[in-house]
Amino acid sequence: RLDSRNTHLIEAVQLMERNIEEPLLIAELCIHLGVSDRELERLFKRYLQQTPKAFYRQLRLEKARWMLQQTKDSVTAIATACSFISLSHFTRCYQKQFSKLPSKER
């Protein structure tokens, strides 16, 4: 998935992918990786053209989209499973990312 050889970036992405249901704070990622938040942000901007926070949100939205397409779980349950703080926040983020409401994904 990543063509970067930067081990900090690869490990950060792997940690994010493993912690979608209970996301880590960016500060926690930095502590785990032994880098500053500024260094992590530079890595993400350089190799992925986005901030760590935006990348993490994108991962969570992609997981939600998969769940909407592959399960019969309610939109609310999926929003919760992907760690969005509210259904309205999830709906806004989803619509911004995919140009459609989550309920229209099925």
Label the predicted regions.
Residues 40:
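Helix-turn-helix DNA-binding module
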Residues 1-9, 13-14:
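Accessory alpha-helical/coil subdomains and C-terminal extensions
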Residues 11-14, 18, 77, 104:
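Charged/polar, solvent-exposed surface patches and flexible loops
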Residues 69-70, 81-106:
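…primarily DNA-binding HTH/wHTH and HhH modules…
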Residues 14, 23-28, 35, 45-86:
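Terminal helix-turn-helix DNA-binding modules in bacterial transcription factors
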